[in-house]
Amino acid sequence: SLDRRQRQMCIRDSIYSHGWMIVRQDYSLIYNLNKLLRNMKKIFLIALFALLPFSLNAESNLDKILSSGVLKVGTTGDWDPMTMKDPATNKYKGFDIDVMNELAKDMGVKVEFVPAEWKTIVSGITSERYDISTSVTKTPKRAEVAGFTDTYYKYGTVPLVLKKNLKKFPTWNSLNNSNVTIATTLGTSQEEKAKEFFPKSKLNSVEAPARDFQEVLAGRADGNITSSTEANKLVIKYPQLAIVPDGEKNPAFLAMMVPKGDNKWNSYVNDWIKNKKSSGFFTKLLAKYNLKSL
């Protein structure tokens, strides 16, 4: 009947009408999503370009050093024979000091040694207090925020104890005991290694200018670990100390720290190290300080 056809047409028109509204809503949603994505893309590009001037146009430390005529070097002054500070004169001496003096001389600039502590030596690089550090051990933790030059010296790690306690502590493992106290110096690579080698032992961390081996000498710790380089010097200076005769562990590499991402400055120092190795400079310097790289 006519009424039936009219009802069908009304239903059809209603479906078309609602369908068009749904389609319009879908198109509106898609349009708004596209608009949102375009805005997000603009924000991302603005942020990216805001960073580009620093990354592309930032002045390299090499340019700053040559312009100012001064090479700023961060050093702790407490690592015999690498860097030692004479409290009477406030002057530095040692293997690292000779290296930095030679670098400054070859660059035609003056060297300025900036006092640093092991616990903050990395932050001195990141905060640009100095352009480069004297020798530090390459570690993954330090490499997260600082750059490293090529290495020029390799050493092992050894424990030190009182000579009278050698029979009690003849091996590395004998020091890994809950009744044993191991001294460490805050911020050093040895602090990290002590946690790895002696998980059962109690750790006594001291802050520079105090040193871990001094805790052993004073009887407040049973032992400490240090580089074979420093250990060989300490047992001569302090005959009451002895190296645990169990062999060296954890060969480590020394390098200078530089600002991370400053490839121009890092490459310059690496080329300098390479040339100095070829010329025999490092070989002569190692002999001067009775050092032997592994």
Set out the residue ranges of the language-model regions:
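Ligand-binding clefts/hinges and TM-proximal coupling segments of bilobed small-molecule sensing domains
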Residues: 60, 189-203, 243-245, 273-294
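Flexible hinge/capping segments at coil-to-helix
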Residues: 62, 163-180
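Short helix-initiation/N-cap motifs at beta->coil->alpha
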Residues: 97-98, 112-123, 204-218, 252
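Periplasmic-binding protein-like
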Residues: 77, 154-161, 228, 232-274, ...
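Short loop->beta-strand "edge-of-pocket" segments that line small-molecule binding or catalytic clefts
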Residues: 69-75, 93, 172-187
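A ligand-binding cleft/hinge motif common to bilobed small-molecule-binding domains
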Residues: 119-123, 136-144, 192-196, 214-250
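Single conserved hydrophobic/aromatic residue that forms the stacking wall/gate
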Residues: 1-14
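Extracytoplasmic small-molecule ligand-binding "clamshell" domains
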Residues: 59-136, 144
